[in-house]
Amino acid sequence: MNYQPTPEDRFTFGLWTVGWQGRDPFGDATRRALDPVETVQRLAGLGAHGVTFHDDDLIPFGSSDTERESHIKRFRQALDATGMAVPMATTNLFTHPVFKDGAFTANDRDVRRYALRKTIRNIDLAAELGAKTYVAWGGREGAESGAAKDVRVALDRMKEAFDLLGEYVTAQGYDLRFAIEPKPNEPRGDILLPTVGHALAFIERLERPELYGVNPEVGHEQMAGLNFPHGIAQALWAGKLFHIDLNGQSGIKYDQDLRFGAGDLRAAFWLVDLLESAGYEGPKHFDFKPPRTEDLDGVWASAAGCMRNYLILKERTAAFRADPEVQEALRAARLDELAQPTAGDGLTALLADRTAFEDFDVEAAAARGMAFEQLDQLAMDHLLGARG
């Protein structure tokens, strides 16, 4: 298989990903800042489909209206010249000190109102540039002290904010949906809507739930010790996987943002298997940080590696599914039986069926092996390249 990506693969990157300068809580930047135009050009050359941005990635915070228009004009010219798309945009509601206690759930009312206006302004730009998804990550929406935040009231304010944003895009006629990005902690000690499940439950309370889905990130769910492919499966089951952030993570620790495929490779295998078999057609967005050990050549090598690893795993998972021995093992594991309704003949028939309870041979059923180990080893063989 050719592992050279093309725009048809729908791989996208945020300006903040390859543009990360390597600054962290313990050290200064190790790389120069990247011009967004340079980023667009380099990513296009690597075969990416598009680029995404926070408002402050593209337009430095505090820019005048004239400066803002100049930045947008240069960016648009780069997009037009390369054919790169902008499938998604988002708002930076976490960097400036004004957001130290959050944005939509800040205790200060004036900060909440400012956050809404800042978001609405960038929604206008996102729609202008053709984005179909608007991501919301509430990195500062949370607390370190149980006394500092009434979580029930904070969720009221969160709901109010999203309802207002939904009202705005509807009134403007924008073809735009929102994707809530969960994260359990960092930078706050505890963040509201920490997992996919929390976000899905929250969405059902909104006035226009059809406008809202989720943008799960590999590392964020794994920081909480959760199974990322399972979270994606539930989002797909709910019809709410509006966007996805791909990266790597090695267990429960800080948010590593490794390139995709680094970290938990088995989870990456099952994730690609799920996305491809489910027919996910949205952008495959890499939200990662090239390690601060790298120079700019290493940055672009890391970005290329994200796409290459996805394509390799796509090939390996397709071979796994097509393998006759795997198909036989799937039948032995009774996956086909799981697809059958448990009581398709209805409750009355279930209650009347003595083989379902009175005459059910519990010991014989308990003695049946599930053949999962053979099936899993076949998956490992394909992942490790030991089978064709």
Swiss-Prot record:
It catalyses: alpha-D-xylose = alpha-D-xylulofuranose. One of its GO terms (molecular function) is magnesium ion binding. Its main location: cytoplasm. Binds 2 magnesium ions per subunit. Keywords: Carbohydrate metabolism, Cytoplasm, Isomerase, Magnesium, Metal-binding, Xylose metabolism. Mg(2+) 1 binds at residues 181, 217, 245, 287. It comes from the Bacteria. The keyword Membrane does not apply. Its EC number is 5.3.1.5. Mg(2+) 2 binds at residues 217, 220, 255, 257. GO terms for cellular component: cytoplasm. One of its GO terms (biological process) is D-xylose metabolic process. The active site is at residues 54, 57. Its cofactor is Mg(2+). It is found in: Cytoplasm. Homotetramer. Belongs to the xylose isomerase family. This is Xylose isomerase. It comes from Streptomyces avermitilis (strain ATCC 31267 / DSM 46492 / JCM 5070 / NBRC 14893 / NCIMB 12804 / NRRL 8165 / MA-4680).
